[in-house]
């Protein structure tokens, strides 16, 4: 087995941060759409937004353009940790099983994607909680990233920072287990078929395909994860909302219908599509650097 290659870790982190900056307002609208309409939480019961574009316009008009980047600091921190570990672990695991990239198979890539998704998302979970809490706040954000971090820790303890970690890991297993293998296999077949070379156009088409696949597979888990993370839990364990992830899933389906699990799908896809395009195009260009 060859020595650990540091490049996928660094390039993965840099490309993830670049993609996050370019698509963050869409991610914010997705969060706002997913937390609204909860019948068991008076604060989020009102349907304020009719869709992604309406949410973008209303947030910008009522809260200011700066509000569209509410939570960008923990999001950047998340990508610096999650994105770095995710891509580096995925590439390292693939080389552990298969030496040559051309010999990669879909089952092996899926296994590597699932493992890297679970590992990276578990480590980076506190930054995800911070991002969602800050995105959910209307008007002025209370205290910035450090202030919100301390507020969660003081009121909810360490447990609050790892709120929803099981769902985050499940979602990451689905997203990474779908997106990265779909990208690799699509790119491989496009090149081997002779239709396209290893160019930016191939990277664009492959990343668009994997973004759509990832959004379809992950949206129900993403809705439940977002609601669980946004729910406050006191140190004594009391909770006024959902008792657990299954309860959240069942209540959402029962009270709001099956398609409530696909709330925020369009902004989710419209984010994952551009996010993956920016990420993979940036990552592929970084790989070409002679370092």
From Swiss-Prot:
Q: Which reaction does it catalyse?
A: sulfite(in) + sulfate(out) = sulfite(out) + sulfate(in); thiosulfate(in) + sulfate(out) = thiosulfate(out) + sulfate(in); sulfate(out) + phosphate(in) = sulfate(in) + phosphate(out); oxalate(in) + sulfate(out) = oxalate(out) + sulfate(in)
Q: Which GO terms describe its cellular component?
A: mitochondrial inner membrane; mitochondrion
Q: Where, per the database record, does this protein carry N-acetylserine?
A: 2
Give the residue spans that cross the bilayer. 9-26, 71-89, 105-124, 164-183, 204-224, 264-283
Where in or outside the cell? Mitochondrion inner membrane
Can you cite a GO biological process for this protein?
inorganic anion transport
Query: Keywords of this protein's UniProt record, alphabetized?
Result: Acetylation, Membrane, Mitochondrion, Mitochondrion inner membrane, Repeat, Transmembrane, Transmembrane helix, Transport
Q: Does the keyword Membrane apply?
A: yes
Reported regulation of activity: Increased activity at pH 6.0. sulfate/sulfate exchange activity is inhibited strongly by pyridoxal 5'-phosphate, bathophenanthroline and the organic mercurials mersalyl, p-chloromercuribenzoate and HgCl2.
Coiled coil (residue ranges)? none
Question: Where do the Solcar repeats lie?
Answer: 7-96, 104-189, 198-289
| Gene Ontology MF term list | solute:inorganic anion antiporter activity; transmembrane transporter activity
Report membrane topology: Multi-pass membrane protein
**Main localisation, per the record?**
mitochondrion
Q: How does it assemble?
A: Interacts with VDAC1.
Similarity-based family: Belongs to the mitochondrial carrier (TC 2.A.29) family.
State the protein's purpose. Answer: Antiporter that transports inorganic anions (sulfate, sulfite, thiosulfate and phosphate) and, to a lesser extent, a variety of dicarboxylates (e.g. malonate, malate and citramalate) and, even more so, aspartate. The sulfate/sulfate exchange is much higher than the phosphate/phosphate and malate/malate exchanges. The transport affinities is higher for sulfate and thiosulfate than for any other substrate. May catalyze the export of sulfite and thiosulfate (the hydrogen sulfide degradation products) from the mitochondria, thereby modulating the level of the hydrogen sulfide.
What is this protein called in UniProt?
Answer: Kidney mitochondrial carrier protein 1
Species name? Homo sapiens
Lineage, opening ranks = Eukaryota, Metazoa, Chordata, Craniata, Vertebrata
């Amino acid at each position: 087995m060859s020595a650990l290659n540091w490049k996928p870790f660094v390039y993965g982190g840099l490309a993830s941060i670049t993609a996050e900056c370019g698509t963050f307002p869409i991610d914010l609208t997705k969060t706002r759409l997913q937390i609204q309409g909860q019948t068991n939480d008076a604060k989020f019961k009102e349907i304020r937004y009719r869709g992604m574009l309406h949410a973008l316009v209303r947030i910008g008009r009522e809260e200011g353009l700066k509000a569209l980047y509410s939570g960008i600091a923990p999001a950047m921190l998340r990508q610096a940790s999650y994105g770095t570990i995710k891509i580096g672990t995925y590439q390292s695991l693939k080389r552990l099983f298969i030496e040559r990239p051309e010999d990669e198979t879909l089952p092996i890539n899926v296994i590597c994607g699932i493992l890297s998704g679970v590992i990276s998302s578990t480590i980076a979970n506190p930054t995800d909680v911070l991002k969602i809490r800050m995105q959910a706040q209307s008007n002025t954000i209370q205290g910035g990233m450090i202030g919100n971090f301390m507020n969660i820790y003081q009121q909810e303890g360490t447990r609050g920072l790892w709120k929803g970690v099981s769902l985050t890991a499940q979602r990451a297993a689905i997203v990474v287990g779908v997106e990265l293998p779909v990208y690799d296999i699509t790119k491989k077949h496009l090149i081997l078929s002779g239709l396209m070379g290893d160019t930016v156009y191939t990277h664009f088409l492959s990343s668009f395909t994997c973004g759509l696949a990832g959004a379809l597979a992950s949206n129900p888990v993403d809705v439940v994860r977002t609601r669980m993370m946004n729910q406050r839990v006191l140190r004594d364990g009391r909770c006024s909302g959902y008792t657990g992830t299954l309860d959240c899933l069942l209540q959402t389906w029962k009270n709001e219908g099956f398609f409530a699990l696909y709330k925020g799908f369009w902004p989710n896809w419209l984010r994952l599509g551009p996010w993956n395009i920016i990420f993979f195009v940036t990552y592929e260009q970084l790989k070409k650097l002679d370092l």
